């Protein structure tokens, strides 16, 4: 089984914020692949289904971002899922809005959710970095906790990620990125 983790903060007040773009992708994948309703487990909202030929558990930690690692560790430990079979979808202020990059391992670039996951399971999991840009003025924390100006474009990108996710899960990272870029340009 694969673990697909969408990072975000719980609560309606954070629903449309940049920090919650991981939740948007997780919800979109669950809908697009007809996963059952999310249930509470492992300090998270969890749903298990299939993404193409891949059995997957989608996890949305029910803790705040800086404590996401606990939920990921519980789900991964319970199902004996190694870090290499975990993919985390998260916001990245170092990328322009709408840019998507994928990597395995590496540093957390100051992202508190990734820092928490690194401490819990190590850093060899896959990361799908979802660009939310940096503010021209003001604080970064204020920026990522503010709502998207164009939430429709975020939902469109989430659907493109979902539509091409099997490429990524099959190990074709370049094909996945190529299709996202091509689709996103349309």
Swiss-Prot record:
Biological source species: Anaplasma marginale (strain St. Maries)
Site (Discriminates between blocked and unblocked aminoacyl-tRNA): 9
Keywords, ordered alphabetically: Cytoplasm, Hydrolase, RNA-binding, tRNA-binding
Protein task: Hydrolyzes ribosome-free peptidyl-tRNAs (with 1 or more amino acids incorporated), which drop off the ribosome during protein synthesis, or as a result of ribosome stalling. Catalyzes the release of premature peptidyl moieties from peptidyl-tRNA molecules trapped in stalled 50S ribosomal subunits, and thus maintains levels of free tRNAs and 50S ribosomes.
EC numbers: 3.1.1.29
Matching PANTHER family: PEPTIDYL-TRNA HYDROLASE
Entries under InterPro entries matching the protein: Pept_tRNA_hydro, Pept_tRNA_hydro_CS, Pept_tRNA_hydro_sf
Keyword Nucleus among record annotations: no
Record-given protein name: Peptidyl-tRNA hydrolase
